Amino acid sequence: MARYTEAVCRLCRREGMKLYLKGDRCYTDKCAISKRTYAPGQHGQSRKKLSNYGLQLREKQKAKRFYGVLESQFRKYFEIADKQAGITGENLLRLLETRLDNVAYRLGFGSSRAEARQLVVHGHFTVNGKKVDIPSYLVSAGDTIAVAEKSKSSAKFKALAENAKGNTPNWLTVDVEKLEGKVVALPSREDIDLEIAENLIVELYSK
């Protein structure tokens, strides 16, 4: 599957915010955007005022990069969100947030979404007792996500979960000893810590 090949720290600088793409490094002084808050490139320090379309595009790019989703799949999520009842922008973020790779990351079973995605692909997780190796798999309220039995002997997962303890969002619970978590409810907009104007994404795709 196609993925971003650009240095991920440049992506954060381009969007002007931390996208938490490098795991633990993002929480240290080594984070690139902590050192250089301007965009990469020769003219990065002279940001131009964006047009309305430019603002809409930037918000879309933020969301895509935050969750590590490429354009074709992102558009499919929008089409699904647009058909659901409720507010389209919030529906879109909820779909992205309930991807298995993101949930594994939120539970602390990956230091970044990229690492969690790789671990999902390699078959390290189960959903309701069945192995799922599709990062885009959407979890539902009541689902139990666990580290597969064959992987529980790895000290890596316990260390990751211990480090993430206390940072689990309200819509999830995690049992560090059992290396499993549960989706207690679908996330509301207040549960999603992405600083983004999702209404601008809706406007962009609605043209």
Curated annotation (Swiss-Prot):
Any keyword Ribosomal protein?
Answer: yes
Lineage, uppermost ranks:
Bacteria, Bacillati, Bacillota, Clostridia, Peptostreptococcales
Q: Kindly state a single biological-process term from the GO annotations of this entry.
A: ribosomal small subunit biogenesis
- Annotated ranges, domain S4 RNA-binding: 98-158
The protein depicted here goes by the name Small ribosomal subunit protein uS4A
One Pfam family recorded for the sequence: Ribosomal_S4
* Coiled coil regions in record: none
Q: Which UniProt keywords apply?
A: Ribonucleoprotein, Ribosomal protein, RNA-binding, rRNA-binding
For this record, an example GO cellular component is: small ribosomal subunit
Q: Which NCBIfam families match?
A: PRK05327.1, rpsD_bact
User: How does this chain assemble?
Assistant: Part of the 30S ribosomal subunit. Contacts protein S5. The interaction surface between S4 and S5 is involved in control of translational fidelity.
Purpose: One of the primary rRNA binding proteins, it binds directly to 16S rRNA where it nucleates assembly of the body of the 30S subunit.
> SUPFAM superfamilies in the record, alphabetically?
Alpha-L RNA-binding motif
Q: Which family does it belong to?
A: Belongs to the universal ribosomal protein uS4 family.
- Show which residues constitute the signal peptide: none
**PROSITE patterns, per this entry?**
S4 (PS50889)
* HAMAP family for the chain: Ribosomal_uS4_B
What is the protein's species of origin?
Alkaliphilus oremlandii (strain OhILAs)
Superkingdom as given in the UniProt entry: Bacteria
Q: Which molecular-function annotations from GO does this UniProt entry contain?
A: rRNA binding; structural constituent of ribosome
